[in-house]
């Protein structure tokens, strides 16, 4: 018997998206499921739909099918068989019953603890050079009194009488498809299958207590504002013997009055006098690594940028060192002596006699 095209089975084109494939499968699986459909060949159609979905929902199988069809090198993709595969019947109807699907997570299975986040504020230099600090964080740890069981010492948990220890109960519901028996978590034991008859007086049956835990955190040199550090296994304790979560330390860096940060580079503005810019000078520039000498060539213009190699921040991942960029700004004096004013007037007079750039610009604007 020749197999129908899988896209034809689901009523889709070959360019259908994953979401369209999933929706088509759900619709047809509801229609042909043997527990619902009264059609004579419902079982065969359901298996056909399930097989088509199993192939088209898998990227690798779908690509192979698109290239070779049913006669491909791995013809016969599985499919058919039981009503397992992609979605179970309980999954299909979960939207009607509030999510009581078949693939429930075992509440007694080991689970990783929750991750925690801690905010820390550093000074500018601390972020550049790194720091080691001890932080106190509130965590939920297993109760020492009951060893995390939640039961009073000397007692133990009992099997839930309502679900006989299975953690699930059967509930009958009327649906558009008829009366359906739905399995859902037992409300008496929260799906654990166990009940605590006598609760621990310290943790009141939760098995956990709130504590403040001291943790040593190493801040790497070169960390920047907004970056975070992961401290493995320092989050909330795991559940049912599962591993602990992680701690994420989010770093905030205070602004500096003189320096600014751009990645691994440090930027600063250096005020110098008109005379230093015109005549040239050697000035002392502060860096996070100490003061350094910087030569200002004669005739330097305000806004000129100088590079101090290797005077920036270290790369937080260890890939070298940034630089410091010094932008010079002329400082115009606000108070002058009579002698200084006379010197400037004399200088200004000499400038007017020169065929300077300013005169050329002036003539250009006048159209001369």
UniProtKB/Swiss-Prot annotation:
Cofactor note: Binds 2 Zn(2+) ions per monomer.
Gene Ontology CC entries for this record: cytoplasm
Domain J: from-to ranges: 5-69
Keyword Chaperone on entry: yes
Essential cofactor(s): Zn(2+)
ZnF (CR-type) residues: 130-212
Binding site for Zn(2+) 1: 143, 146, 200, 203
Residues annotated for Zn(2+) 2 binding in this entry: 160, 163, 186, 189
Any GO BP: protein refolding
Compartmental location: Cytoplasm
Single GO term (MF): heat shock protein binding
Pfam family, one: DnaJ_C
Source taxon at top rank: Bacteria
Family, per entry: Belongs to the DnaJ family.
Subunit structure and binding partners: Homodimer.
PANTHER family: CHAPERONE PROTEIN DNAJ, DNAJ HOMOLOG 1, MITOCHONDRIAL-RELATED
Domain notes per entry: The J domain is necessary and sufficient to stimulate DnaK ATPase activity. Zinc center 1 plays an important role in the autonomous, DnaK-independent chaperone activity of DnaJ. Zinc center 2 is essential for interaction with DnaK and for DnaJ activity.
Protein role: Participates actively in the response to hyperosmotic and heat shock by preventing the aggregation of stress-denatured proteins and by disaggregating proteins, also in an autonomous, DnaK-independent fashion. Unfolded proteins bind initially to DnaJ; upon interaction with the DnaJ-bound protein, DnaK hydrolyzes its bound ATP, resulting in the formation of a stable complex. GrpE releases ADP from DnaK; ATP binding to DnaK triggers the release of the substrate protein, thus completing the reaction cycle.
Record protein name field: Chaperone protein DnaJ
Organism this protein belongs to: Bacillus mycoides (strain KBAB4)
